[in-house]
């Protein structure tokens, strides 16, 4: 049927238009309502008129349809602006001709014009559809479209124009037209379907639908109303439509028969074909009179259908024999409507074109546009709110992940050398001799350095040899015989000394820079070699990642998901931008102009639908975020392990890179510094060589003069014979030795000689040392050569030490130099050169006799004046400040000429002189203490100790004159031939003097000279005086009483000696040691002053230092513990040692003035950080000697009064001086306490109850304490619930801010050091941690963190682990000096250096690694041993009031348990019994919340304390239950915190302990080392016990190996003594001690000028020069010994 001829189509005629005069009406309306010039719209009106003319004379083609649509649209635009409807203001008559009747119809309504145009549009489309022959597919499509457009136009006209303006536009006619057009469109579609051979069933349904449309049209045509309207046309249309109905019905049944044939339903096939044939016959009947095209189509159909029917009937009759069903029984064919009226949009801009009247916009349109804009904004806000919420979640999630897609998988970067490093390699590749030149330059510098040092050493040797020869000459001929010598030669020699000292000072400063330069070169030369080498080696030196394939897969997966996240972000941003742009460009004002107000809302909804697609995309993007983040979380979990590896690799990579780049950048600087050093030393070498030649010539001249004098004296008559006694040979003094071994105090005799050299100061002090001058003239020469620093210009050059050492300073007053000699029996006048201060007269004192010269060393601040004759003047710069900034004014005095008197032994009394105030000079470095020897030496800043007689006090002291008696606090002469003067502490100035109603001159005005006390004949000052009774002559307001033994130690770093700037000959301070009492001596108190111990001489009483009270008595405080001090009795005196018992006096009062040594008072207590805190080591109880009147019993010491202003001064640690459990009743009491203590926490209920009470108490206490400051620094707190209280937090004084999460925990036990409980440093707070350690002068750090926590990076490693690789934290550099691992802990010795200062502090870092974060240590024993180690290290430090820093991860859990057990153990060891642990816990928590965080920790501490008490009982012979009592073996490890004195180089001890022990090998027995026990520590009365309760002789627990099971007898034999090795004979005699002394970072020096001077041997200890050696003969029958204690040196 596809070739069937096409049926004809029905089409409609066009209506004809009449007049439409709209121009005048529009102009009037514009003028009236818009207020605009109507003439301005003439052009628009012309355009509209032209468009109408084209529309009413439209062409019969597709372009005509566009013209009609455009004109229809412009009419709508005009109507929206100018109301021209029926009855409206601008209505104009419109005329059109009616089609069927040909009449003209007029209406005053613009809608009539629109309706006529719509009708013509539909008619034109029907014409165009019917005109096509439909022979091609394209023609069929075009015709179908035209008929649908025509149906659409008629349908729009029917729906939107309900009023029938004319008959041809009535509703019935319009419905007929719609059905006709749809039927013809469906017919075209049928023809196309048959041409395409669609399925038979589909074609049948399409054909049936054609039948349905035509049936609807036929019913309309049969309507009488319609028939009357149509007239003649109605009959023609009806015949054609009826014929088509039957024809297309036949076509439908034909195709249904084809479908039955396909389904092999042959009976149905026959029925359908029969029906089709019947309907076709009906169509033929109705086709009579139709055109030939219709007849051809019917014939073609008959041939097809007839043939099909005949064939089917035959097949069924002869083959299939199926029954032919009736047509009614078969399934009816339902039509399939595939066409529809195409809608007409009159205002479609694509059709209407631009609005001609766009300039005319009514206000209603603007209002509607605003409403639409609000709808758009609402839509945008809604979407943006969703996007922002999702973006915020995404940003927070990604920030928490800290994942950067660019760095997640950047493994490629590690395979290449970075560009900045490549540049350095390239720069070095063109200079191949870089390393060679640097090494050669440093070698040349080292050679010149060595030459200069050798020359300076030669000069020093010459000067020392000359001085030694001069001394020998004086010893041989006597002072009178020696004579002053040629003054010119001495002046030249003094000039040489000054020049040598100046060059030596410069050389030593430069040697520091030289060593630093060598260190820097050694640090960088390896890196420079690497950078100069092949690139492969450089690449190999950089760390590389070692990842498994699984790790790489994890990285790729994470990278892929991160890319998805980024893609999601980008898509979201893009969609958001599209939405914004679309909304911004969306303007429907033109549409609103043409839209009715009633349809506004509908229009808005339709317009907003254009955003639906973007909204869907955005919502899908937002919904996908949850899935992406879930996948990213899983990938990040897998990435954690890989991330840690890559993070560590990145740190190592950057560190290595920075190190290599820094080495390259340091090369030029090293070369420059090296060249400067060579230039400097070349200049210095020439000057030193000149000085050497000069010194040689002067010394040769001096030697010749001495030889002449000796020859002349030998010719004289020899002196009469004197009693002789054996004396050791006078060996040559060691080089650089400032004093003789016999002249030094016992503390220093066991040290290497370099430790006793006065001017050998560490480099950091060179810049502050005052110049020293020896004035030519007859002043006493030193018996030992010493080096001195000279003033004057330095050699040119800029090669010097660190900058801070060379800063210009004000004229800082310095203390007098220290020289240690026994006090002679005469005095020499030593005054002061007048300065700028007011002048004061100085009372002169006559010479007390003639003897060996008294050595005097001073520190002048300017070249001295040239004096002649016996007059001698020196300018002294006293130190005026300590670290506590105690400033004393400086004044100068006129030194009167000495008055010679007969050579009679006279007692000499110090006369304190009033000193006016002058400008205080701050001193930058601490002045711990100094010793000076002389007569009128001023006592400088607080705590200056002088040995001599007349001394001046500097500072604002009250003006008092002292009677002829030695005031308190001044040297006390010893009786006996070997007695020596004792240095006493400098009295502290008090604000108001107290009157002294004594027979003495009254205080004078400052301008009046002080009268000279007249000497009176009396006993010799150094003769045997068995009946001397000193009376306590005291100035309590000048010398406040202080309980000895508990003064705060000085603040310098433990393990090394900090010398006082400007003071020569300082001995290193020693720690407090204890001595066993010998068979005939009293226990020696701890001693650290630089004083010699006298040897036993003839029988004489020994004074006991007694202490006067404070101005007013106060209760005995923690710092006022009475300590018994007993001086050593004579070796062979049978009488008991008498003691002086002073009585307390609230205020100074009058007293007799006997010429006897009075008692001395201890210095006052100082605040923490005060340089004078060394009083603990130099307090009166440590001074061996003093008068001791007859009488027995212990001295009663008075409690000191703590000043109110000193209320919060730190308390020094109480030492456990002796074993408190020697008494059986103490042991029995401890055993009873242990039995009761065991059951306190026996069951869980008791533990729970105690813990609950502690928690409640903590909450109660915490409510009254503030942590406001800690809350301000939340980033510095590891846990937000663990913060220090404001009241006792540690305050940083020099950081960016003053906060650190650390609390001071004090008051747990008098025997437990103060603790600083802090958290483990965070990566950002490590600098604060080390700053706190530096400011608090901490020497011991306890770390209670397991290795697992550091490996997991829960706790940052804030300390260096490799030597030579220091860590820099802010301004502090921390370096590892040594490391030692034991079974219980790891001990590290660290050095702490502030910025670029050369001075370093050593501290001990004790790490207990076996305490897990959640759990307990393996055993209590390990922790107990660790606590003992901690306490032992703490006792090695100086002073004993600095805190111990203890930290775990949080600073409360393990830290609290450690502090609790530490305090409890110390209480038990002190004999105070077992403390109440809950009370200690509450005391800790009152100072830091959450201390002892777990209940398990409390139980553990209870068990550990039980175990410790059991150990204490076992040590004293009390066995555990079930074991027999064994003899007490004190050789077991003593758990008392006593200093270990039984080792020098032996034993398995940490190197830090050996270093600290060096300073303690100083006390030796007064009777020589005949008794082995004499080398043991002495006893001091234990705190807390009354003096009378101390037995006369008690054993002291010691850490030495030999056992001591019984108290020492009164006079035991040597073989009964415990075998204790003598300190001087341990190890190599000298080199070992020198090695130990140089082990501390402060003592160690690369300065080769110190080499070659350590020549001590065993003979130095056995045969000392001054007769004080171990084998020195002790003459007891020499009557001359009463006059000269150094007589044995002069015997031949």
Swiss-Prot record:
GO-annotated biological processes: cilium assembly; early endosome to late endosome transport; endocytic recycling; negative regulation of epithelial cell migration; positive regulation of adherens junction organization; positive regulation of early endosome to late endosome transport; positive regulation of homophilic cell adhesion; positive regulation of Wnt protein secretion
Entry annotation: catalytic residues: 1448 (phosphocysteine intermediate)
Catalytic activity: O-phospho-L-tyrosyl-[protein] + H2O = L-tyrosyl-[protein] + phosphate
Region (His): 773-1186
Polar residues biased stretches: 884-894
Sequence repeats: 977-978, 979-980, 981-982, 983-984, 985-986, 987-988, 989-990, 991-992, 993-994, 995-996, 997-998, 999-1000, 1001-1002, 1003-1004, 1005-1006, 1007-1008, 1009-1010, 1011-1012, 1013-1014, 1015-1016, 1017-1018
Family stated for the protein in its record: Belongs to the protein-tyrosine phosphatase family. Non-receptor class subfamily.
Annotated protein name in UniProt: Tyrosine-protein phosphatase non-receptor type 23
Organism: Mus musculus
Gene designation: Ptpn23
